[in-house]
Amino acid sequence: MSASRHPVLWGFVLAALTISFLTPYLPVAWYAEHGLMENVQCALLGLAALSCLYGYTRLQAQMDRWVWLGMAMVFLVFVVRETNMMRGVLYDADAIWFGVHNRLYGRTLMGAMAIFALTCLILGRAWRWLHHKAMPVLPILAWLLLIGFQYVGERGSFGLGSMGIVLEENSELLVYVGAWLIFWYHGRVLLTSQSSTLKDEKIPCLP
């Protein structure tokens, strides 16, 4: 299995090995809620969203532009998730007056953004990736495994104790790295090598 045939998988492995090597030397405080690791995750997600918007501006095929715009919104949804954006905007008294708990604001914002992202992906017919086998099996399996690790770490299962938060944050970071690698490499190859412009397709409203 050469690196040239599976660049995403090897990039994934390199990121995992790097994080595993550095973890014992990093303070546990960096993994706390809203700590340094979460800021690193937000920075990575923001860069991923910007890279998708860059791809959006570089493509001419209308359906492809929808897909890149939709993926940018997907990454931004995770930015909102990591930052708890819009949660606790109002004082408790104001929230009671509106009859809605503060924490619902963040979920409402993420829901609206997710619906917009899904709409873009549907308009761009993102399932074309599956037909052309652009989505690699091995990186996706590794990605799903990391999501399982994140679930275990978040709940502190198997007596992990304080190491649970370390496992959770490292797994989340690798999930985001994997998502970016999978989309940017395979999406770029597929979406720039094929013309899918149809006369009746609409172009997204962004310039």
Predicted regions and their residues:
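N-terminal membrane topogenic signal
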Residues: 1-13
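Membrane-interface helix-boundary motifs at transmembrane edges
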Residues: 2-3, 54-67, 124-135
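Hydrophobic cores of alpha-helical transmembrane segments in multi-pass inner/ER membrane proteins
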Residues: 11-15, 41-54, 106-122, 172-190
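Juxtamembrane "helix-exit" motif on the non-cytosolic side of transmembrane helices
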Residues: 20-30, 84-94, 122-126, 151-161
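Short, hydrophobic transmembrane alpha-helix segments
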Residues: 23-36, 54-61
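Short aromatic-rich membrane-water interface segments that cap or initiate transmembrane helices
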Residues: 31-39, 95-109, 165-173
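Membrane-proximal helix-loop-helix units in multi-pass membrane proteins
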Residues: 78-131
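C-terminal transmembrane-bundle signature of multipass membrane proteins
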Residues: 148-158, 167-204
